[in-house]
């Protein structure tokens, strides 16, 4: 460490040895000049310089050396104080250095192979690899897409990225149009297609959240998701005490089902039946409902059972209080009274934990006008993120073999995913990414409150497709920064004589002001990538994509029929499930011919 400090001290001062030599020779010249006094020596100074510089070696006379060193020190002090008090000029950047990015700025972030990129604009792309040759160019694939209604969020972002087919995809599909338009293409590419349709249950595959419970902490996550995305309509359902009591009750019932129920009864139908069988009487504290008796028998068998411990805490409340809690629970799960929804959630065909194993496309179709069943979608996404993270850590050493991209269109309508601000910060390393698609940033703040900024901060890329919401316009304008411009002022003075004046000065101006962003051309977009100048580019022309001809946009014959696909898909057989296997020879086929 001392050696390094010594180098820093000596090396910058080496040039000042020249001044030691110059002042030394000047002192020698003055000393060698003939003359009895100062004026005489000055008059014959030329003779002294000739004598002094006849030999290039420095004078070793003590006075000459002292003057040489003193002169060099004086020069060093002048340079030091001049540097300390120097004016810091940034010519042309007095008020800011913002500018639009160009092809050279984005070049290090683009993979030469077109298919290995995330499509952002017509001219900008982002490589899928999270480990480029130079680590400083690594960026996460979390993208915040903002665009008002009709700005082309689906056409200019979702569909072009589906056509890249380099990952597994989870797509929120309002109205179900993306599945129809892109399903055939994905099927041709060897993708397994999964569909959860909360608009038309007949066109949906089954999804059973109980099939993905692996531990007691998964039970807690499921209960928290249900409570966060549903409302109990009881008188006191919004108060903290009542919500905590409901949580205990749900944990007890779901814990009982997960541990004790037969495999075909591990679903929400059983949960509803248990809630319906629960009862509390204010006037009879000794009354026991069928559910009370079930837990009593379970306690006799295993007093430390998770479900028993939760239920005993629930029973600490008085009979009247428990009645209110049961009413709130019934109101919260009222949507499950619909038979089609119960049937949808009885069995499971989604195989959520396999999305990172092989290329799969999961389409989550939600209504853009009715959020009644959106809590089911919240449960699915919560389980999906947790399942994939756990599998990446436990099976694949921290990274999934197939990247999973979540294109979360109409993100505000999905509902609240518990701890999403923490999930989005950690999924990157597991080869999972989320594209959050919103109409305005205020939608995110309405759901996630103070955590909205954390979520935005974990998206290295922001793509603005257009809009007029004031908060979004203000934040986009501030994000772009200020540029320095030249201003010319002219003045005219009228009096006895007419005089004119010109004044040039520098001013700071937003690279794009709020009103300019609001009236931005419909074919343009603004892209901001972390660590790079912003881009003002054309939106991606979907018709120029090599695979566009396989979409139903190009040819109606390419429309995907989900009902036909569901009828023809092979049955899902679990590893532990017994089944019969028949071998058919060519001779058997010949015998069957007429």
Regions found by a protein language model. Give the residues of each.
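Conserved ATP-driven motor cores of ASCE-family P-loop NTPases powering translocation/secretion/packaging/pilus
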Residues: 424-526
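Low-complexity, polar-biased intrinsically disordered regions enriched in Pro/Ser/Thr/Gly
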Residues: 126-132, 231-241, 486-505
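P-loop NTPase motor domains
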Residues: 9, 139-432, 447, 452, ...
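Basic- and hydrophobic-enriched, low-structure N-terminal and domain-boundary segments
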Residues: 1-151, 155-158, 202, 482, ...
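A short glycine-/small-residue-rich loop at the edge of a beta-strand within enzyme catalytic domains
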Residues: 107-108, 114, 375, 411, ...
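Short alpha-helical interface patches
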Residues: 52-55, 65-117, 216-226, 274-277, ...
């Amino acid at each position: 460490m001392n050696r390094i400090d010594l180098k820093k001290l000596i090396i910058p001062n080496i040039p000042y040895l020249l001044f030691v030599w110059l002042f030394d020779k000047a002192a020698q010249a003055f000393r060698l000049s003939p003359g009895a006094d100062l004026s005489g020596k000055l008059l014959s100074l030329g003779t002294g310089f000739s004598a002094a510089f006849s030999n290039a070696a420095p004078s070793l006379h003590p006075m000459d050396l002292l003057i040489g060193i003193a002169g060099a020190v004086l020069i060093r002090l002048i340079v030091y104080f001049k540097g300390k008090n120097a004016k810091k000029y940034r010519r042309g950047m007095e008020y800011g250095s913002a500018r639009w990015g160009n092809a050279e700025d984005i070049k290090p972030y683009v993979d030469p192979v077109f298919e290995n990129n995330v499509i952002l604009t017509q001219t900008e792309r982002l490589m899928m690899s999270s480990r480029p040759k130079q680590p400083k160019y690594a960026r996460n694939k979390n993208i915040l897409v903002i665009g008002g209604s009709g700005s082309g969020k689906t056409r200019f972002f979702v569909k072009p990225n589906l056509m890249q087919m380099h990952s597994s995809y989870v797509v929120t599909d309002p109205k179900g149009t993306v599945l129809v338009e892109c399903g055939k293409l994905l099927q041709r590419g060897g993708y397994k297609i999964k569909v959860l349709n909360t608009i038309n249950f007949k066109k949906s595959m089954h999804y059973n959240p109980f099939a993905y419970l692996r531990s007691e902490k998964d039970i807690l996550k499921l209960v928290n998701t249900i409570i966060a995305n549903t409302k109990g309509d009881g008188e006191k359902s919004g108060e903290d005490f009542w919500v905590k009591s409901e949580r205990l009750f749900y944990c007890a019932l779901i814990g009982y089902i997960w541990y004790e129920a037969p495999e075909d009864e591990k679903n929400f139908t059983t949960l509803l039946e248990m809630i319906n069988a629960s009862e509390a009487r204010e006037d009879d504290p000794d009354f026991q409902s069928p559910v009370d008796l079930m837990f009593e028998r379970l306690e006799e068998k295993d007093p430390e059972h998770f479900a028993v411990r939760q239920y005993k805490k629930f029973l600490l409340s008085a009979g009247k209080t428990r009645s209110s809690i049961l009413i709130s629970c019934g109101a919260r799960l009222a949507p499950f009274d619909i038979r089609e929804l119960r049937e949808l959630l009885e069995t499971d065909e989604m195989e959520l934990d396999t999305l990172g194993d092989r290329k799969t496309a999961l389409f989550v179709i939600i209504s853009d006008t009715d959020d009644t069943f959106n809590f089911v979608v919240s449960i699915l996404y919560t389980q999906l993120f947790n399942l994939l993270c756990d599998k990446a850590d436990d099976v694949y050493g921290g990274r999934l073999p197939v990247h999973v991209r979540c294109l979360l269109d109409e993100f505000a309508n999905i509902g609240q995913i518990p701890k999403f601000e923490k999930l989005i910060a950690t999924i990157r390393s597991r080869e999972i990414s989320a594209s959050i698609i919103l109409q305005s940033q205020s939608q995110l703040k309405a759901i996630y409150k103070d955590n909205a900024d954390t979520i935005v901060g974990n998206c290295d890329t922001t793509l603005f497709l257009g809009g007029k919401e004031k908060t979004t316009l203000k934040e986009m304008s501030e994000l772009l920064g200020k540029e320095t411009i030249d201003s010319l002022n002219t003045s005219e003075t009228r009096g006895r004589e007419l005089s004119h004046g010109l004044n040039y000065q520098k001013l700071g101006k937003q690279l794009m002001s709020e009103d300019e962003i609001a009236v931005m051309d419909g074919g343009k977009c603004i892209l901001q990538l972390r660590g790079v100048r912003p881009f003002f580019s054309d939106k991606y022309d979907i018709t120029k994509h090599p695979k566009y001809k396989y979409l139903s946009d190009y040819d109606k014959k390419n429309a995907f029929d989900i009902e036909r696909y569901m009828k023809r898909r092979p049955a899902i057989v679990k590893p532990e499930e017994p089944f019969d296997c028949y071998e058919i020879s060519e001779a058997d086929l010949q015998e069957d011919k007429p």
